[in-house]
A protein has these predicted regions:
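Cationic, amphipathic, low-complexity segments that mediate targeting or membrane/lipid association
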Residues: 2, 23-36, 40-43
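Polybasic, lysine-rich low-complexity intrinsically disordered segments
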Residues: 11, 25, 35-38, 48, ...
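Short hydrophobic targeting helices and cationic amphipathic motifs
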Residues: 5-15, 32, 39
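Compositionally biased, low-complexity peptide segments typical
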Residues: 17-20
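Short loop/turn segments at strand-loop or loop-helix junctions that form parts
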Residues: 119-124, 161-164, 405-408, 451-453
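Active-site-facing alpha/beta catalytic cores
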Residues: 125-126, 130-379, 422, 430, ...
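N-terminal basic/disordered segments at the start of proteins
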Residues: 56, 60-115
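Non-transmembrane, aqueous-exposed alpha-helical and coiled segments at domain scale
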Residues: 356, 371-403, 409-457
């Protein structure tokens, strides 16, 4: 029976049969000196056999998730309308191509080995109402500004992945929200229902998936144009950074690094290295990602690659599973186990090393470098206690994992004036702990995952401009969780640059 259930059988055979047997044969094993070799070979063989059986028995299909326990899904009142929307999405062109997802996996493999750094960031949740070219451009600019600082400090490439062109659906802690004695379904993101607090807006509407698709396609078009149309020129990006540090609050802290970068670019120009003969100076790659939460949407955009026969979720280059939906036997993990995109999974303070190992065995059975990104989100007060053991035990298993830190979700608080916010110092503290713990454990601190915007919002307190709780009301624009504004995001990049120098 274990061969019929691919989510369980490989671990069952290894833990129940192989490992105890090898343990009992200690004397023979010691004489041959093959303890670790035998175990590692067996595990690799079992992983490969698992993939063969999984494909051979066709246990996965793009709609097989529907047979599994599923969380955080809306209840659509009109099933016929839902089916119509799904069928329409299945006929639409892919938003990304399989080859691009493979390129990202190769880039993330370098992150896994410590040869590159992952910068992943963007809106908590994209919205239909705030969609415009200026907002996308400003987000793109801040990502580039952060990346050039991190590249220069870390002396390694930065893999840029936006939470963009699909980051619409949001998990909620409660199915309902109450205001002034009125109880309505919770807002789950513009792809599902409306933000306005009225009964009509809060009804899940499957046609919103179609609108989300078109907005994502427009966003992808802009990102591709920005990446190759001159906006990514390193000299321009550096000029933006020089403008940033002209503010007196910042020059003393970060001016030296920015000026060193200017001198380096000037030296390269003097040597004849410029945008006209070196495209890398004026072009860049920005990949897209989002939480694969709304599975009807993800299924509809999952396509079989004509070159390899593998399945890819073509709604984004990279997908991740949230902390609330990462059950190893649940629908979200099952669905993403069958697509070949790079994957992420959020890991909170209550997770154990066995949780991470079990997820890796299901989501990355061939142990490919660059396939799996574990996104730590524990909070500044808990990461020091919880993360070291996970790193230690996962390292012992020999698993190829990209570790990144999400310092946002574990540090969310409610201000005295009722606004949900995050303190810059707490965000920085968790990032710093993440780097220090990895250095102590001999593992790679692979990247950061941030909720941020290119706009001058006032949603997170602190930073060099010392935003306080009274400032939150000035430009509190998020429809979900608080984001770092442009200045706070770039300041955080300069501070992370100091951590990278020590690696």
């Amino acid at each position: 029976l274990s061969f019929i259930f691919p989510l369980f059988w490989r671990n069952y055979i290894y833990l129940s049969l192989i490992k105890p047997y090898v343990a009992q044969k200690g004397a023979v094993r010691a004489n041959l000196g093959l303890k670790f070799e035998i175990l590692s070979v067996i595990k690799v063989l079992l992983a490969k056999i698992g993939v063969i059986f999984k494909k051979g028995l066709k246990m996965w299909s793009r709609d097989s998730w529907r047979k599994f326990n599923i969380l955080q899904q809306p209840s659509y009142p009109d099933e016929a309308l839902l089916k119509k929307a799904e069928d329409k999405l299945k006929t639409m062109p892919p938003l990304v191509f399989a080859g691009e997802a493979r390129n990202l996996k190769q880039d993330l493999a370098k992150v896994c080995s410590g040869e590159a750094f992952l910068l992943q960031g963007g809106d908590c949740a994209e919205s239909f109402s705030n969609f415009n070219a200026v907002n996308i451009r400003d987000m793109f600019k801040v990502m580039l500004q952060m990346a050039i600082v991190l590249t220069f400090a870390g002396r390694c490439p930065v893999v840029k992945v936006g939470r963009v062109a699909g980051q619409f659906a949001k998990p909620r802690s409660s199915d309902y929200e109450e205001q002034g004695g009125v109880k309505l379904p919770s807002y789950r993101g513009d792809i599902i229902n409306g933000f306005e607090f009225n009964a009509e807006a809060r009804v899940p509407d499957p046609n919103r998936m179609i609108e989300a698709y078109y907005q994502s396609a427009s966003t992808m078009n802009l990102l591709r144009a920005f990446s190759r149309g001159g906006l990514a020129d390193l000299h321009e990006v550096n000029r933006w950074n020089l403008g940033f540090i002209k503010k007196p609050e910042l020059d003393a802290k970060y001016g030296e690094l920015a000026r060193q970068l200017s001198q380096t670019l000037a030296f390269m120009g003097a040597c004849g290295i410029n945008a006209s003969n070196t495209p890398a100076l004026s072009e860049t790659k920005v990949y897209t990602s989002h939480e694969a939460l709304l599975l009807p949407y993800e299924e509809a955009l999952t396509r079989e690659d004509s070159l390899t026969g593998d399945w890819y979720d073509c709604s984004a280059h990279m997908l991740w599973i949230g902390e609330r939906t990462r059950g190893v036997n649940d629908a979200h993990v099952h669905f993403l186990s069958g697509v070949h995109n790079p994957l992420g999974v959020k890991i909170g303070p209550n997770a154990t090393s066995q949780d991470v190992i079990a997820l890796a065995n299901v989501l990355n059975p061939q142990n490919e470098a660059g396939r799996l990104n574990v996104i730590i989100r524990m909070g500044a007060d808990k990461i020091g206690e919880r993360l070291p053991k996970i790193l230690r035990e996962v390292k012992r298993e020999g698993l190829n994992i990209v570790y990144s830190i999400d310092p946002m979700h574990g540090n969310t608080i409610k201000a005295a004036n009722g606004y949900k916010t995050r303190e810059f110092d707490k965000i920085l503290a968790e990032v710093q702990s993440f780097f220090e713990i990895h250095r102590a454990e001999g593992t790679h601190a692979g990247g950061v995952h941030l909720e941020m915007t290119g706009q001058d919002v006032t949603e997170c307190t602190g930073g060099s401009f010392k935003l306080n709780e009274d400032d939150l009301a000035h430009r509190y624009e998020t429809q979900c969780d608080p984001r770092l504004n442009a200045d706070q995001s770039l300041e955080l990049a300069f501070l992370i640059a100091e951590f990278l120098k020590k690696i």
